[in-house]
């Protein structure tokens, strides 16, 4: 099973990137959710503009699909500067990064997605650039090699990662601002779905938006993907208007249940309940029972189930919680 193939995957495709770009908020005033992040960034941006300085370097981390790229775009728009975008895996050589840095205008924003995947060689170049706005470049080889310094304009580096723990301490410590994005509350997701529906020219009731929001796993990217599929259903099977009932019919047809679980989530939980009496069950046994790789279970399926309190990871193996039993209408066994 490939994670990107799942309707409830938080990873994005190229098509979705283009589609979502058109409906993303452009300014903090339009930004929904993450109230603490929004209020802090308002102050930091306003202070930098009052001083005429570049904004401090910003690290944004959190699960995929929560709007790290959106926030980077908003910062650049609020500061009134250009945004240059790249990603960790693309910057293979020190020269790749040097070329981007030397083309920046004063106060520009350089956004590096998946910054935890920077190579050590590239990361070394980044340290003096972030700290002193200077590039240290080696010219020549062997005994004739010499270091030259190139001054850079003041700029803001925004790094985004789903794995903050994978960043090296020297890199992490050079970010003056660190923001964690949390899963969205249902009312905020409902607002996002309604806003996206308006941008797409859809007629959608508040209850319809709420139904989509409830099944979106706290993730705007998933909410927008589900909205597009509900739109298809409404246009083909009905008159295009999306009510709560039509949204529920569409999502049920797509095998996305009331908790946002798809077929694979339910298959894993039911295997623990039915085949292993609720657990504990070892990861290898569970992988064999559902026909998946253990890495897929650990990295793709488990995290959301554990976060939502449906699965427990114990020293003796995986266990289904009472909430998981109740979700399927099965009476949990009496605790000894």
Swiss-Prot record:
Main location: cytoplasm
Spans annotated as Large ATPase domain (RuvB-L): 4-184
Chain residues that bind DNA: 294, 313, 318
Pfam families: AAA_lid_4, RuvB_C, RuvB_N
Cellular localization per UniProt: Cytoplasm
Location of region: Small ATPAse domain (RuvB-S): 185-255
Chain sites annotated for binding Mg(2+): 69
Subunit structure comment from the entry: Homohexamer. Forms an RuvA(8)-RuvB(12)-Holliday junction (HJ) complex. HJ DNA is sandwiched between 2 RuvA tetramers; dsDNA enters through RuvA and exits via RuvB. An RuvB hexamer assembles on each DNA strand where it exits the tetramer. Each RuvB hexamer is contacted by two RuvA subunits (via domain III) on 2 adjacent RuvB subunits; this complex drives branch migration. In the full resolvosome a probable DNA-RuvA(4)-RuvB(12)-RuvC(2) complex forms which resolves the HJ.
HAMAP family: DNA_HJ_migration_RuvB
Domain observations: Has 3 domains, the large (RuvB-L) and small ATPase (RuvB-S) domains and the C-terminal head (RuvB-H) domain. The head domain binds DNA, while the ATPase domains jointly bind ATP, ADP or are empty depending on the state of the subunit in the translocation cycle. During a single DNA translocation step the structure of each domain remains the same, but their relative positions change.
Protein name, per record: Holliday junction branch migration complex subunit RuvB
Organism: Klebsiella pneumoniae subsp. pneumoniae (strain ATCC 700721 / MGH 78578)
Gene for this chain: ruvB
């Amino acid at each position: 099973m490939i994670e990107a193939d799942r309707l409830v995957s938080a990873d994005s495709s190229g098509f979705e990137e283009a589609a979502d770009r058109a409906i993303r908020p452009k300014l903090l005033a339009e930004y929904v959710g993450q109230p603490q992040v929004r209020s802090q960034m308002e102050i930091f941006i306003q202070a930098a503009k009052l001083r005429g300085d570049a904004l401090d370097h910003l690290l944004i981390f959190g699960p995929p699909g929560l709007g790290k790229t959106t926030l980077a775009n908003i910062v650049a728009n609020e500061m009134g500067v250009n945004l240059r975008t790249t990603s960790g895996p693309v910057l293979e050589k020190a020269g790749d990064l040097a070329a981007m840095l030397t083309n920046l205008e004063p106060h520009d924003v350089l956004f590096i997605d998946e910054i935890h995947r920077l190579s050590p060689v590239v990361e070394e170049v980044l340290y003096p650039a972030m700290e002193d706005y200077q590039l240290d470049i080696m010219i020549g080889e062997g005994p004739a090699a010499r270091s030259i310094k190139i001054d850079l304009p003041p700029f803001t580096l925004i790094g985004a990662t789903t794995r903050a723990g994978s960043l090296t301490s020297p890199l992490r410590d050079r970010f003056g601002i660190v923001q964690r994005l949390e899963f969205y509350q249902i009312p905020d997701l409902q607002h996002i779905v309604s806003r996206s529906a308006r941008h797409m020219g859809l007629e959608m009731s508040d209850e319809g938006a709420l139904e989509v929001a409830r099944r979106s796993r706290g993730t705007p990217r998933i909410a927008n993907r589900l909205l597009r599929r509900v739109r298809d259903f409404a246009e083909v099977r009905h008159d295009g208007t999306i009510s709560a009932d039509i949204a529920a019919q569409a999502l049920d047809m797509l095998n996305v249940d009331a908790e946002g679980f798809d077929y694979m989530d339910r298959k894993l939980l039911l295997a623990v309940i039915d085949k292993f009496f609720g657990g504990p069950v070892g990861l290898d046994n569970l992988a064999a029972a559902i026909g998946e790789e253990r890495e897929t279970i650990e990295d793709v399926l488990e995290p959301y189930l554990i976060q939502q309190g449906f699965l427990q990871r114990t020293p003796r193996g995986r266990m289904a919680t009472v909430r998981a039993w109740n979700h399927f209408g099965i009476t949990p066994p009496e605790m000894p």
